[in-house]
């Protein structure tokens, strides 16, 4: 069928097939491998096509499967996990199967051995049948068999014991495991406890930290208070001084007034005296009445004066007293000041406040404790009352009486007893289990079994059952044997009876002797012994020997008979159980005949006859003795009568013994017979004569005694009779007793008999069941045999052969494995993957058949079902166990409850018995409390259990997670391995050409690869040729076009310029192009080599993949992305073939199909690259290349980039070639023209001159245009700036208005404060903090502008200047012939940059507007706060009215409060403002943070929020609890009151004793203590939670602050980076411009020098013009001004745009000079121009094309020197700038600026001196040197300036270090709290410093004017520079001043705000008990 596949199935048919048919075809193709040689050659191709199609179909299937796998990964994982589980199950089942197989083998061997034994037994049986003539030998064999069985039984017993020991060990192990688990649980619990302890410790630590922080805050607050008090004290001192001054002035005034009065009094006295004398002299005649009136007047005046004097004296006294009091007050104040200064002694006010606080807190605590105690007492009393009432009611209803309680107690005791029994039983079970575990451990140790190994007990149990069955069988056999023995005994007794019947004809004596009552089977030997005392006398030695022999024979017969019976029974059993044992009927018949013959044996009859003979002999002897003593018959008869009683007494116990013997059967029949027989057999022959003589002597003694008796008295006889009578009574009693005992024993015997019968019946039943079991086992054995036979039939080989084969197979497999390992080591299995089949680790193969696989599947299903059943059973068992545990727990709980009830009842009984009702109540309460406590403890234990459970579950979860991870990892690894194996299998199918089969002709692959290589080479050659062809054609076309253009439009000068430009560009581009081309070629070559190597190494589909796998999509992409290039591709036909092969051959999906996302990524990457390439211009290709190299990580990306760049370069190269062609033609044309112009023709000369003039005019026009454009743009920017300035001004005005409003508000606040102060005498001083605050708030907006923006504005101005200077460089270099186009483009860029700066200014304006809005908002908030403060003020005033005694301190406190609150408000406003600014910045600059940081911060914030929420909820819950508690307390109080009333109403039952009261009090105290402890714990928990909350809040606040700081730092860093990048860009631009300008200027200057030298040779007028030139030229590259332009090439902030002037008429337009000289020396000028052009051409050709020559070298060196100098100067400037900024910042931080200013002045002086020295040197050099010396001087001067600047930088650095060190040492509070006097001093110093600076500046100006007069025009630039530097210095000083002012303000603000914050925090915490962080964070 396989031969006809190609005929029956074609490709078309195959495609129409269904999936099943395709699968069948695939399988048939796989089967083809066997019959591969039979295939005909013609159908090979078709089969190959078919196989390829099948493989393609399979590949598609694989791809679909992979897609589905990729789609449903989650389900796949689950399935894989299940698969893993099933694999493990399979592995286990296989292991078990192997074990079962091995067991089956062992059983088979055992069965064979048993069969052999059975055969041997059968043979022996046959032999025994044959040799049946000898029954003894048969018996021997039977005995041997029995011995074997016994040995087997012993072996079984030993095994059973071992199994038991193993089980015990197992149990012990399980117990130890349980113990270990418990230990583990305890350890876990301990761990949990430890972790809790750790958390507690951490919480305590945190609380301590918080306390420390609080203390620190308190310290800071106290320090603030101290400073405030100091300030107040100083104020009071000032006031006191003022007061004293006033009073002193007043006192002085009073003294002066007093003196005046005294003088007036004296004068008046003198006047009076004078008047009195004059009146006495002149008017003696006047009447007495007038004198009296005058005297009265004078007296009145004097009295009035005296009164006035007294008043004044009183006033003076009062003043003196006031002075004294004031001095005392002053002294007190001084003392207080000293005390305040003393740091150890605390202040009085603080002490008072602290003491009061302490007292208040102590009082509060006492009150709270009293309250709590009272409440607790109330609760307790209410509870007691309730319980008492309930108890009383119960008592009344007889529910709680004594009798029911006792009944309950008894019932409970019974229950307790029952529980105790149960517990004991459980304990016994547990002990037994422990013993089992110990036994198991011992057994494990003995057998060396490790603890981990689990031993299955099923087999052991089954074996044990079998052994038990065997034992039961054997016991049954024993019982049957015993029954047989019984039967034998019965038969024996029957025979004896028959014998006795036969011997009835014997004498009467015998009959009498035999008539004794006897049991069945008893030998009546006792009677004979009693009746015949002389039976031992008789025969001699011969008879005894015969008797012995006879006895031996009898015993042998008996043993043989019993053995025969046993053997017969065994044979019957064997016959029943086994098929093989067959007993002959003859043998059985013989045995049966032999056995009953034993009943009538002659031995027994002979024994009986002998006995009878012995008896007869004894009777004869007795008769003879009677005849001998005939005379003494009467005496003898009396003796006999006397002796009969003891004989009778001796007979009874013998009989009873006999009865007992019959009841107790002997174990073996032989022993019984012997025991019965030995005493019965008499030996009359053995009795000697001496015995008879001894008897006679005894009889004589008796006779003598009788005689004595007879001769004795009647009394003696009576006594003797009495004794005998007593003896007889005793004997009768004994007999009665013995009878009773006998009856009892008889009853017992009957019971035992019935029991034995029942047991026999049971044994019969058991026997029947065993027989059934035996039948069942037989059937099983038959089945096993059949199976064994089947196995034997299957296994054709014997066991030995099988073993040999297995051994050989193992050796071969080992060899094969080694060979495979070696082979795979050579083949590199990592590359090829793995072999086909089930691949092991050693790369061996196992093939499995379909049948085996199906069997395995079925087994798997069965095992799964079994597993499901087992799981179900285990679940059920677990459920049962759970239920049992719950029951146990419930029982334990019940027990506990019962015991508790029992105790309660006892208490109740005791309470009832006690007389007092209070005792009863207390007992009840105590019981309830105990029950509650028990309940609490139970709940606690349950909680702990739950915690443990949770921990266990957590650990289990973690373990499961770990295991899951591990399994996932294992699964991944296995999956990768399986994938590798799968791939290797697929590969190996196609690698069979070398190993197994030759149905796939893959030989053409190598040829194909070789052909492909050839094809590639041909393609490359063709491409190279095409390139060459295209190139030449293009050049031809370009040359033609250029010639046409040159012929028509262009002039020679323009051509020359273009030529030079294009040549330089093309050079550069060529070099770059060559480098990139080389790179690209190398990469392409490497790629090709790689592909070829891969193709040759791997299989055919891999080859195709390697060669063409990535070809199509990538080429398409390239065509789409790069429209200019064509992808290198083979022919269409070739590609089609490749596609067909790829589609048909590769069974694995191509990597392009597998990974579509990779393609998209590459597409996007390529697109990005292309986009960047299109955006970049031609001059930036190198930088772009570098970027590409940096960004590309893989070789593929590099290759793509290099290709793209190469294509670009090729384009640029083509353009350059075109340009070269054009320029070459232009050059040729210009040369020809120059040659033509060389001929002396006037017209041509005029034309050339005109062309030059036109060229210059055009250039001037273009320059003018650019200048106009620049001017317009500048005007526009100026307008925009002016607008912005106006806007800024308006904004500032608004800000000022707002500040004014704030000031008014502050004034209002001040007014309110003044109202507060009630003393009108003390002058109200305004608080400096408010002033500073108002000033700071007024300048806040300006400060913000100046702080943040001044530096940026200054930098922007300095950055704006250089581009303008750079723009003017090419403008000045305009009039020359050769002008580049690049600077113009640069100018445009700079203009656009200037325009770009406008939006930044707009942004600034927006920011200002935002700030304005914010300030308005803040004003509103301020107003609201003012209102609040007013309200608070009112409240404070009311309080002050109420509290009159403490007015002053309260006023001070209010003032402090107001200040603090203002500060706090300000601080909050600032923090809010900062927060808003940070938010806005963060929103603007989100890119500053990385995503990870943001995510972390967000997570932290979320966490903190969550924790805060949790804490809030906890707090709320606690509050609710508190509310509930309060409600309950209220209810309890009400209840207690009601109960008290009830108790009062109730009659008193009993009198309270002191003892009871004491006990009660003690109990109550204990309870109170306990409840207090509980309350303290609850409070502690609350406090802990609060502290935790506060800690969390502080942490979150700290985190927020850190975050804000980080944001600020990042923003600053970003700003600085941006500035740095801008400066670098500006530097690069200026460098490029300068390089271009230098090159052009250097060339022009050299040409100029040559021309001037030529002109100098020709005539004097040219010299004058040259001198003129030298005078007027002011370009930076001019050789006349080389010493001036030291630092011109790199623009600096010190240079302004005004230093450069526009192009002067003298210097910029050479046409002017030419027109002056044209008339005089026209021909000379033409010659000079010609020579100049020639020189230029030569130089250009020499420099640009060859790149060699001394001129080029010199120019290059000059360029390098200039660049070096420029860079060094710039670096120094930047360093100086950086140091300056650092110094400024340090200065601002330090706070004191006097030393800094002095040092700054000193540095400025040094700098001016250095500049003077430089100027002097320049002058001297200018006077001395010229020509080459000039250049050297220039270099030296540059070096000197650099050195001086470096020295300056060193000084600045040292100063910076000093400042940094100084700042660390001087930072303290004293520096922060600088007084106004110090500020004034600093201002004075600053003014002096400014004066010094101005003086120095004036001196400098004078010197510079002198220098300018001396130096002339050359010093102008230096003067301008100096002026600029001065301006800069002035600006800097101004900036410094502003910064200082701002810093001082900021420091003051900060201080005030800190104080405010501290106070506000304190107040808030005191008033509201709310943490301050909450307010800030919210």
Curated annotation (Swiss-Prot):
What GO cellular-component annotations does this UniProt entry give? centriolar satellite; centriole; ciliary basal body; ciliary cap; ciliary transition zone; cytoplasm
Its primary localisation, in coarse terms, equals cytoplasm
* Stretches with biased composition (Low complexity): 276-290, 1329-1341
What does the record note as the disruption phenotype of the gene behind this chain?
Adults are severely uncoordinated and exhibit disorganized spermatid cysts with dispersed nuclei, likely as a consequence of the severe defects in axonemal elongation. RNAi-mediated knockdown in developing sensory neurons results in defective microtubule (MT)-microtubule (MT) and microtubule-membrane connections (Y linkers) ultimately affecting cilia formation leading to olfactory and gravitaxis behavioral defects.
Q: Where in the cell is it found?
A: Cytoplasm, Cytoskeleton, Cilium basal body; Cytoplasm, Cytoskeleton, Microtubule organizing center, Centrosome, Centriole
* Sorted UniProt keywords: Cell projection, Cilium, Cilium biogenesis/degradation, Coiled coil, Cytoplasm, Cytoskeleton
The UniProt regions of compositional bias labelled Polar residues, in chain numbering, are: 1693-1708
Question: Does this UniProt record's set of keywords contain Manganese?
Answer: no
User: Which portions of this protein are annotated as coiled-coil regions?
Assistant: 76-384, 471-505, 853-887, 922-970, 1192-1233, 1405-1439, 1501-1654, 1726-1935
Q: What is known of its domains?
A: The C-terminus orients towards the microtubules and the N-terminus orients towards the membrane in a 9-fold symmetric manner.
Explain the purpose of this protein: Essential for ciliogenesis in sensory neurons and spermatocytes. During neuron and spermatocyte ciliogenesis, essential for initiating transition zone (TZ) assembly and is required for the formation of diverse connections between microtubules and between microtubules and the membrane. Regulates TZ assembly by recruiting DZIP1 to the plasma membrane where it promotes early ciliary membrane formation resulting in the initiation of TZ assembly.
Q: Please state what the protein is called.
A: Centrosomal protein Cep290
Q: Which organism is it from?
A: Drosophila melanogaster (Fruit fly)
What does the organism's lineage look like at the top? Answer: Eukaryota, Metazoa, Ecdysozoa, Arthropoda, Hexapoda
């Amino acid at each position: 069928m396989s031969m006809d596949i190609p005929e029956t199935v074609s490709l078309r048919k195959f495609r129409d097939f269904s999936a099943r048919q395709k699968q069948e075809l695939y399988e048939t193709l796989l089967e083809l491998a066997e019959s591969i040689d039979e295939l005909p050659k013609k159908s090979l191709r078709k089969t190959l096509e078919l196989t390829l199609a099948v493989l393609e179909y399979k590949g598609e299937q694989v791809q679909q499967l992979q897609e589905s796998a990729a789609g449903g990964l989650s389900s796949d994982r689950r399935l894989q996990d299940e698969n893993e589980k099933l694999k493990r199950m399979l592995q286990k089942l296989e292991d078990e199967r192997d074990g079962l197989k091995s067991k089956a083998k062992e059983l088979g061997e055992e069965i064979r051995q048993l069969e052999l034994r059975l055969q041997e037994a059968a043979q022996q049986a046959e032999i025994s049948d044959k040799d049946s003539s000898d029954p003894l030998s048969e018996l021997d064999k039977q005995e041997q068999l029995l011995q074997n069985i016994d040995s087997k039984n012993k072996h079984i017993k030993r095994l059973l014991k071992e199994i038991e020991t193993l089980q015990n060990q197992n149990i012990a192990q399980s117990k130890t495991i349980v113990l270990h688990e418990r230990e583990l649980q305890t350890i876990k619990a301990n761990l949990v406890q430890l972790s809790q302890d750790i958390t507690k410790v951490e919480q305590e630590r945190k609380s301590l930290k918080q306390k420390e922080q609080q203390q620190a805050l308190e310290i800071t607050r106290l320090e603030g208070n101290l400073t405030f008090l100091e300030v107040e004290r100083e104020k009071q001192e000032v006031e006191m001084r003022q007061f004293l001054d006033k009073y002193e002035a007043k006192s002085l005034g009073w003294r002066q007034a007093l003196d005046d009065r005294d003088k007036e009094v004296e004068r008046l006295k003198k006047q009076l005296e004078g008047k009195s004398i004059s009146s006495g002299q002149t008017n003696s005649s006047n009447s007495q009445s007038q004198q009296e009136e005058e005297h009265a007047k004078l007296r009145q005046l004097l009295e009035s004066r005296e009164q006035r004097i007294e008043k004044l004296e009183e006033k003076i006294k009062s003043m003196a007293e006031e002075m004294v009091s004031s001095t005392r007050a002053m002294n007190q104040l001084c003392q207080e000041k000293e005390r305040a200064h003393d740091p150890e002694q605390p202040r009085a006010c603080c002490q008072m406040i602290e003491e009061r606080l302490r007292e208040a807190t102590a009082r509060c605590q006492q009150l709270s404790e009293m309250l709590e105690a009272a409440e607790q007492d109330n609760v307790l009393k209410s509870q007691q009352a309730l319980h008492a009432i309930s108890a009383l009611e119960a008592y009344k209803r007889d529910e709680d009486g004594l009798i029911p309680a006792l009944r309950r107690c008894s019932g409970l005791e019974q229950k307790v007893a029952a529980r105790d029994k149960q517990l004991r039983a459980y304990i016994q079970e547990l002990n037994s289990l422990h013993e089992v575990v110990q036994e198991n451990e011992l057994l494990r140790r003995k057998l060396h079994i490790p603890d981990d190994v689990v031993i299955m007990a099923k087999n052991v149990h089954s074996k044990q059952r079998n052994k038990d069955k065997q034992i039961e069988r054997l016991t049954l056999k024993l019982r049957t044997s015993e029954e047989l023995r019984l039967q034998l005994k019965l038969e024996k007794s029957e025979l004896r009876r028959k014998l006795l019947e036969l011997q009835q004809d014997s004498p009467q004596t015998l009959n009498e002797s035999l008539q004794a009552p006897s049991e069945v089977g008893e030998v009546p030997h006792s009677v004979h012994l009693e009746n015949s005392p002389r039976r031992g006398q008789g025969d001699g030695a011969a008879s005894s020997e015969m008797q012995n022999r006879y006895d031996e024979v009898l015993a042998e017969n008996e043993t043989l008979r019993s053995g025969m019976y046993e053997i017969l029974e065994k044979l019957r059993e064997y016959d029943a159980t086994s098929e093989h044992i067959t007993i002959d009927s003859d043998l059985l018949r013989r045995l049966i005949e032999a056995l009953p013959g034993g009943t009538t044996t002659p031995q027994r009859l002979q024994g009986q006859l002998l006995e009878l003979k012995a008896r007869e002999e004894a009777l004869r002897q007795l008769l003879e003795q009677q005849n001998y003593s005939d005379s003494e018959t009467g005496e003898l008869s009396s003796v006999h009568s006397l002796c009969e009683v003891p004989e009778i007494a001796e007979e009874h116990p013998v009989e009873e013994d006999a009865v007992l013997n019959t009841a107790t059967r002997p174990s073996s029949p032989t022993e019984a017979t012997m025991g019965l027989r030995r005493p019965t057999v008499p030996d009359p022959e053995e009795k000697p004569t001496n015995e008879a003589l001894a008897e006679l002597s005894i009889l004589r003694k008796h006779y003598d005694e009788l005689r004595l008796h007879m001769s004795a008295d009647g009394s003696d006889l009576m006594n003797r009779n009495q004794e005998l009578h007593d003896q007889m009574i005793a004997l009768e009693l004994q007999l009665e007793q013995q009878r009773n005992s006998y009856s009892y024993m008889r009853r017992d015997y009957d019971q035992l008999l019935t029991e034995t019968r029942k047991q026999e019946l049971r044994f019969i039943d058991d026997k029947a069941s065993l027989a059934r079991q035996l039948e069942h086992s037989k059937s099983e054995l038959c089945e096993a045999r059949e199976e064994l036979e089947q196995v034997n039939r299957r296994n054709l080989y014997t066991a030995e052969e099988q073993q040999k084969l297995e051994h050989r197979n193992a050796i071969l497999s080992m060899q094969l494995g080694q060979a495979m390992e070696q082979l795979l080591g050579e083949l590199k299995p990592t590359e090829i993957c793995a072999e086909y089949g089930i691949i092991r680790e050693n790369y061996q193969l196992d093939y499995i058949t379909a049948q085996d696989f199906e069997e395995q599947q079925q087994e798997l299903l069965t095992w799964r079902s079994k597993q499901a059943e087992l799981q179900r059973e285990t679940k059920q068992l677990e459920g049962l166990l759970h239920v049992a545990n719950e029951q146990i727990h419930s029982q334990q709980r019940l027990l506990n409850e019962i015991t508790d009830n029992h105790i309660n009842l006892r208490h109740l009984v005791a309470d009832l018995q006690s007389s007092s009702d209070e005792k009863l109540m207390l007992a009840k309460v105590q019981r309830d409390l105990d029950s509650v406590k028990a309940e609490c403890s139970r709940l606690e234990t349950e909680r702990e259990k739950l915690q443990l459970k949770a921990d266990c579950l957590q650990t289990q979860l973690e373990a499961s997670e770990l295991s899951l991870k591990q399994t996932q990892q294992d699964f991944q690894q296995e999956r990768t391995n399986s994938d590798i194996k799968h791939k290797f299998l697929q590969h190996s199918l196609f690698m069979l050409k070398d190993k197994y089969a030759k149905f796939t002709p893959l030989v053409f692959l190598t040829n194909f690869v070789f052909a492909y290589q050839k094809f590639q080479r041909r393609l490359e050659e063709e491409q190279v040729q095409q390139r060459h062809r295209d190139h030449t054609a293009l050049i031809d076309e370009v040359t033609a076009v250029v010639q046409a253009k040159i012929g028509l439009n262009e002039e020679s000068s323009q051509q020359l310029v273009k030529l030079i430009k294009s040549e330089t560009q093309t050079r550069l581009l060529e070099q770059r192009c060559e480098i990139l081309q080389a790179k690209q070629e190398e990469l392409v070559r490497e790629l090709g080599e790689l592909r070829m190597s891969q193709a040759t190494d791997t299989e055919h589909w891999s080859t195709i993949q390697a060669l063409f796998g990535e070809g199509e999509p990538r080429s398409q992409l390239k065509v789409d992305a790069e429209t200019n290039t064509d992808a290198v591709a083979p022919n269409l036909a070739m590609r089609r073939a490749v596609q067909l092969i790829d589609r048909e051959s590769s069974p694995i999906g191509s990597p392009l199909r597998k990974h579509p996302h990779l393609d998209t990524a590459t597409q996007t990457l390529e697109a990005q690259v292309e986009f960047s390439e299109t955006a970049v211009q031609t001059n930036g290709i190198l930088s772009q290349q570098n970027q590409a190299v940096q960004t590309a990580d893989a070789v593929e990306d590099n290759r793509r980039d290099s290709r793209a760049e190469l294509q670009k370069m090729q384009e640029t190269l083509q353009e350059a070639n075109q340009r070269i062609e054009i320029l070459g033609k232009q050059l040729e044309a210009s040369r020809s023209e120059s040659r033509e112009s060389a001929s002396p023709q006037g017209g041509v000369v005029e034309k050339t001159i005109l062309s030059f003039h036109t060229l210059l005019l055009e250039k001037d026009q273009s320059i003018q245009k650019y200048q106009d454009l620049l001017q317009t743009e500048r005007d526009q920017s100026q307008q925009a700036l002016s607008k912005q300035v106006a806007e800024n001004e308006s904004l500032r005005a608004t800000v000022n208005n707002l500040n004014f409003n704030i000031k008014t508000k502050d004034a209002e606040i001040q007014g309110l404060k003044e109202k507060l102060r009630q003393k009108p005498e003390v002058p109200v001083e305004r608080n400096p903090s408010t002033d500073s605050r108002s000033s700071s708030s007024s300048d806040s907006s300006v400060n913000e502008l100046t702080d943040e923006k001044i530096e940026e504005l200054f930098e922007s101005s300095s950055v704006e200047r250089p581009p303008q200077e750079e723009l003017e460089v090419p403008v000045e270099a305009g009039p020359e012939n050769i002008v580049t186009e690049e600077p113009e483009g640069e100018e445009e860029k700079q203009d656009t940059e200037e325009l770009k700066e406008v939006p930044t200014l707009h942004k600034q304006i927006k920011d200002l507007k935002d700030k304005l809005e914010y300030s308005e908002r803040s004003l509103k908030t301020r107003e609201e706060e003012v209102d609040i403060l007013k309200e608070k003020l009112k409240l404070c005033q009311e309080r002050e009215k109420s509290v009159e005694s403490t007015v002053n301190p309260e006023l001070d406190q209010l003032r402090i409060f107001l200040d603090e609150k203002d500060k706090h408000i300000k601080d909050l406003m600032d923090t809010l403002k900062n927060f808003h600014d940070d938010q806005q910045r963060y929103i603007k600059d989100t890119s500053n943070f990385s995503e990870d940081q943001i995510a972390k911060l967000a997570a932290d914030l979320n966490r903190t929020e969550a924790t805060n929420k949790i804490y809030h909820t906890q707090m709320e819950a606690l509050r609710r609890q508190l509310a509930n508690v309060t409600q309950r307390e209220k209810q309890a109080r009400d209840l207690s009151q009601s109960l008290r009333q009830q108790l009062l109403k109730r009659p008193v039952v009993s009198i309270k004793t002191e003892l009871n009261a004491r006990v009660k009090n003690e109990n109550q105290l204990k309870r109170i203590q306990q409840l207090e402890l509980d309350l303290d714990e609850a409070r502690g928990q609350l406090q802990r939670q609060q502290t935790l909350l506060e800690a969390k809040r502080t942490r979150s606040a700290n985190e927020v602050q850190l975050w804000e700081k980080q944001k600020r730092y990042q923003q600053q860093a970003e700003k600085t980076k941006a500035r740095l990048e801008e400066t670098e860009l500006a530097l690069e631009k200026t460098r490029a411009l300068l390089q271009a300008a230098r090159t052009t200027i250097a060339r022009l200057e050299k040409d100029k020098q040559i021309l001037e030298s030529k002109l100098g040779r020709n005539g004097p007028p040219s010299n004058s013009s040259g001198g003129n030139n030298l005078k007027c030229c002011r370009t930076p590259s001019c050789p006349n001004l080389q010493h001036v332009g030291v630092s011109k090439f790199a623009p600096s902030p010190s240079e302004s745009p005004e230093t450069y002037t526009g192009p002067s008429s003298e210097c910029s337009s050479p046409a002017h000079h030419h027109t002056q000289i044209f008339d005089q020396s026209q021909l000379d000028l033409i010659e000079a121009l010609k020579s100049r052009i020639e020189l230029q051409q030569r130089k250009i050709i020499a420099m640009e094309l060859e790149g060699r020559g001394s001129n080029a070298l010199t120019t290059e060196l000059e360029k390098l020197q200039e660049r070096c100098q420029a860079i060094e100067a710039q670096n120094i400037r930047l360093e100086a700038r950086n140091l300056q900024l650092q110094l400024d910042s340090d200065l601002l931080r330090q706070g004191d600026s006097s030393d800094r200013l002095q040092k700054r002045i000193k540095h400025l002086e040094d700098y001016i001196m250095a500049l003077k020295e430089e100027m002097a040197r320049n002058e001297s050099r200018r006077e001395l040197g010229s020509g080459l010396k000039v250049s050297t001087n220039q270099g030296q001067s540059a070096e000197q300036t650099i050195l001086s600047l470096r020295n300056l930088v060193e000084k600045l650095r040292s100063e910076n270090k000093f400042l940094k060190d100084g700042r660390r040492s001087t930072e303290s509070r004293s520096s922060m709290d600088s007084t106004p006097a110090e500020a004034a001093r600093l201002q004075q110093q600053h003014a002096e410093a400014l004066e010094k600076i101005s003086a120095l500046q004036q001196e400098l100006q004078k010197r510079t004017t002198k220098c300018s007069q001396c130096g002339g025009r050359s010093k102008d630039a230096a003067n301008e520079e100096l002026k600029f530097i001065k301006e800069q210095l002035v600006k800097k000083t101004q900036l410094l001043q502003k910064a200082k002012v701002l810093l001082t303000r900021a420091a003051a603000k900060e201080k005030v705000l800190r104080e405010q914050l501290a106070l506000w925090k304190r107040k808030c915490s005191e008033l509201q008990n709310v943490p301050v962080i909450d307010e800030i964070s919210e």
